[in-house]
Each structure stands twice: as structure tokens, then as C-alpha cells.
């Protein structure tokens, strides 16, 4: 047992004992450990596994801990012949050990066992679903993804996470993952950077997430669309209309060959509603969408287009009729909740629009001008006041002096006080300065990477001149002409 | 670090420790998983669940997460959501969503709340009053004293001088001739938002990687 334990603890994580080992040596250690653990017949008995799981730390010996957890799960699955044994169900011993592992594993060690790591995450999701409590998996998978840091690489786990969030109605928990830009798919192994050690801490994380690293199941076109569709739904549940519109916009702008998929049409319907609710109007589809695709969307979403037209024309009667007529459609499309919110949004944008025509109105005037508003005279003041107080309507309110009970609504050019305006300008200046600094740093880095910095270009020009003069003087193959001079070496030292 | 097990005493300790609203939300959200593993039909655990979900609900309101609070009411076990206190939470949520100030104060002050949640109920009332005061200050140029008092849940029949004093202490001015209060706008810095920086960094890194 002590020999086996010695093997299990032979490669601690970098901060816990392997900090001074070279990348190459650490890589060897980890690969040796994996080879040892994968040997047939090396698996310990059930009782021993529990002992080892108690003895080693999931944060320090993540690779070994993961291996033991998997062996234990397999043993239980074979013994009980069920996919989710009792011990793995939420609250069970194995569940607790898995939770501990996923919240503390060392992301460097896990790069070597992506497939096994993902299988464990899948087991957690299945276990939570088996007891109809998907929320138990949501935070754990989110934390695991954050810990792993996929650095903008889209994986099948992202899709799983957003599905679980929708199933469990726990939307805010997944925002840390959804708010991050995803701009890569797992890279092709063929094109992966050769010679890069998986334990290297200085390479961009994207290098480690390849199609054979195991961190993601095979991804399809549909997975990508589903992820953004579901992300849009999460944002809509939180009434973050701009983000929802962005995600749904990605789905409707996806490239198509001949046909438009159903999910794209569903996304278009939700995109129309998200824009109505967020901006009170129907936007043109993004430029990326081909005209024939737009025509398909419009022909398959006619009730939604009619609804949006009635909304934009501020035709309340028609809007009410459209909503009433389309009830079975909204229900079938699972958009009833969104369509119901259209009434409230209609009133809001009707009042906001008054500010484009008038500079001040009394509340009775507001009611008269917004006669199509669904609110009655009693509720209109309360509604307008709530719009102003929540800053949805840029206006000011003032009560009249004396015994009059009139409230005046003013639409000033700027609803902000001088001090408030200055504070906002100051804040925006700070924000712009930080943005410019970020861009500037990135440009410098890019120049170094592309070798187009001013110093590099000077050296190249100098080398070319020297090469020209050497050739003219009959000297070929000088050191400087090959770019091997001291200056060149010094300048290029950090650029690689 | 392992969390101490969820219990009534532990819950009281978290609530009475007086953390910031964000810390309170973070602490209680960490306990949601433990709460999910308790049985809503077991009488000994039912009380704990009721107290936990009531406190968690208030932590959402204190951090202005109204939509997520609505989502929370959907994931509370049915046996708990049927209880009077949770029904009161739903009433309060609707009143907050509809900005019905009078109703909000009435629900907070007059309806029964579980014992351990009382500090949070009072804390939310103070928070809501402060938030409303800022909103009034930035929305109204002039406001009648009765209206201002109603927004803050003060008794309009109370001594006028006391109400005026409360507002003038916040920098508002009282025009006795016109019988109107002149609010003083509250300048607050917009919340810090790192998303632009993060996105820019990612986009620039992407350009750099693609170019190399």
C-alpha cells in the first residue's frame, strides 16, 4: 500500500512541491504517473481506494485523486449495474469527494487527463439530474470551468451548463461563464503547436484545448447554435435585453448552406421579441444574414412581424388583436411569457416617445397624449413616476405649489444635474483611458509577436543594407547579414 | 474551505454577523446546495428550509436582483413555497417589481415574518427607504411633503415639522411659501464595470494570436 501511495504522491502540483522542477521534468513525472495508473491490475480494492481518497489532497495530487474517483465510480457501477450509484447521488460519500475535487483541482495537472475530467463532470450532471435537482450541478460545473479556464474556447460543457441553468431556473449563477467571450473552438490536433509541454504555464491556454484533449465532446454546428440560443434565454429571464439580442443575433447570423434550421427560426422569433422589449422597435437583421435567409425568417415568423409592426406603429388595438389571435402560436413556441411583457413595454415606449415631441406635460396631458396606453388614469401617474425613478425615462417630475395635485413631467435636454453629469463624464474618461491603455499594450505585444516593432524594422533595414554592401564588396554570408549579430539577438530575445 | 453545516444557529450567525449585502448573498448562495439536500417534508428540516429561503430571498432584494429573486421563488420546494411566509415573500416581490411603495411598507411592517428573518426585514426596509430617497432626489424637482413622506413609508399625519426636518437633514430645501420640498440630487459614481476592459483584452489577444 505504501508503494502505491508513494506513486500517487510522486507528482505534487506546482505550488506544492514541484515549483523548482523544469517543465520538461515535470511533464515526464506526470506522464509516468499516468502510465503507471493506467496499468492493468494496478487498481486497489474498494476499501483501499477510500483510504487513499482520505490520504491524498485533491488540490495537490489532482491527477491521482481523479484516477481514484473514476475507479471507485466504475467499481460501484459494475457492482450495482446502475448509472448513478447511491454513493454518487447528491449527499453521498462519492458525491462529496467529487465536489471537493472539482472545487480544488490543479488545472495544470488536469490538462493531461481532459477526457477523464470531463467524464467526471458528466457524472456530476447525471447524478444531479437523477434526483431532479439540476441546480446542484450548476454551481459546481461553473466553478470547475472557471478553475480550468478554457480561455475563450467553447466546449460541450458550456452547453451542458447553460442547459442545466435553464432547467433549474438559476440564471445568475452562470453569468460568470456566459459573460465571457467565446472566440475559439477546440483547435485541430493536426495544427496544434508541436513541442509544447502541457504543464507549461507560459503558453496561452487555447493551446491545450484541442479536439483530442478530451475537455469537450465532439461539437456540432447544432451545439454552437443551441448554446447561444439558451444563453439568450438566460439573459431574457434576467431582462438583460441587449445581451439576449446579441446571443440570439449570433444564432440567426450563423452561416447556412441551403436550408435554415428550426433553431435559427426559433431564435429569430425570440430576437424580435427581445428587441421589442429592450428597445421598442424591430431592428433590421444583422448584415451577415443573407437576404434569402431573412425572407425565410420573415415568412416563418409572420405573427411576430405583425406584432412588431403594430407595436412600432403604436396601434394598441391592433397590438391587442395580434396578441389575442396568436395565443396558440405563442404557447406552442413557448413565448407566451415574453409576449405578455409586450403590453408593459408598449406603455413604457409610448411614454418615452412623448419626450421627443414635448418638453413638459402635466399628467392629465400625458394620459390624453398616450390615450392608447393600457393604463387607466389612476395608474398612469404611478407608472410614469416609476419609469422616472428607475431611470428608464429621462425626465424630471415636479409638483405644483398650493393645493393643486398636478404633477408636471419635464423632458429636459439632460435629466442629469451638473454635478451628476460631471461625475459621469469623469467616469467615461477613466473608462476610455483604460480602454486605450489596453489597446496600446496589446498593439505593442502584437508588434513584438509579428516582429514589426520600430526597432526590428530598423535592424532588418540595416541588415539588408549591409547585405547589399557585402554583396557589392564580394563578402557573402557575413554574421550580421544572417541576422545573427549581437544587437539582433538582444532585441529578439523576448519576442519569441 | 468546507462550510459549516446549515442549521438554524448557523443561519442566525450568518444573518447577525451583519455582512455587506453582497457578502450576505454570497454566503447564503453557498448554502443553497446544502438546502437542496434537506427534506421539505421532514418537520424538523421544514423550519430550517423556511428560514433559509426567506433569508436568501431577502439577500436577493438587498442586492437588487429582482429577476433572480423571481427565479428563486420558482426553485423553492413546493412544500415550502406554500407556507405563509413564502407567500408573503411573493407578495413583497410583486410590490417591489410594480414599485408600489405603500404596499411594500405595509407588507414589511404588518405581515408576519419568521423570527430569524426579522433583522433582514428591518434591514431591507432601511435599504429600500435609502434607495427611494436617492431615487426621489434625482427624479423630483419639487415634491409635496405628503408624497415624499409616503415614498419613505412615513406617516403623513405625523408632525409636519418632523418630516420636514428628516428631509432637510439630507440637504433638501423647504419652501414654506409654496409648501414644497426641493430635493438635492445625489451624485453617485456609476458602478465599476470591467467588462469592456476584459472584452478588449480578449479581442486584442485574439488578433495577436491569429496574426502570429
From Swiss-Prot, chain A:
Cellular compartments annotated: Cytoplasm; Nucleus
InterPro entries on file: COP9_N, CSN3, PCI_dom
Keywords: Cytoplasm, Nucleus, Signalosome
UniProt-listed Pfam families: COP9_hel_rpt
One Gene Ontology term from the biological process aspect of the record: ubiquitin-dependent protein catabolic process
Chief localization: cytoplasm
GO cellular component, as recorded: COP9 signalosome; cytoplasm
Domain PCI: residue ranges: 243-411
Disordered: region residues: 468-496
Compositionally biased residues, Acidic residues: 483-496
Family, as annotated: Belongs to the CSN3 family.
Annotated function: Component of the COP9 signalosome (CSN) complex that acts as an regulator of the ubiquitin (Ubl) conjugation pathway by mediating the deneddylation of the cullin subunit of SCF-type E3 ubiquitin-protein ligase complexes. The CSN complex seems to link protein degradation to sexual development.
Quaternary structure, from the entry: Component of the COP9 signalosome (CSN) complex.
Protein name: COP9 signalosome complex subunit 3
Organism this protein belongs to: Emericella nidulans (strain FGSC A4 / ATCC 38163 / CBS 112.46 / NRRL 194 / M139)
Swiss-Prot record, chain B:
Disulfide bonds: none
Record-level GO BP terms: COP9 signalosome assembly; protein deneddylation
Source domain of life: Eukaryota
Disulfide bond recorded as keyword: no
Keyword check for Cytoplasm: yes
Assembly notes: Component of the COP9 signalosome (CSN) complex.
Protein family (similarity comment): Belongs to the CSN8 family.
Listed name of the protein: COP9 signalosome complex subunit 8
Organism of this sequence: Emericella nidulans (strain FGSC A4 / ATCC 38163 / CBS 112.46 / NRRL 194 / M139)
The gene coding this protein: csnH
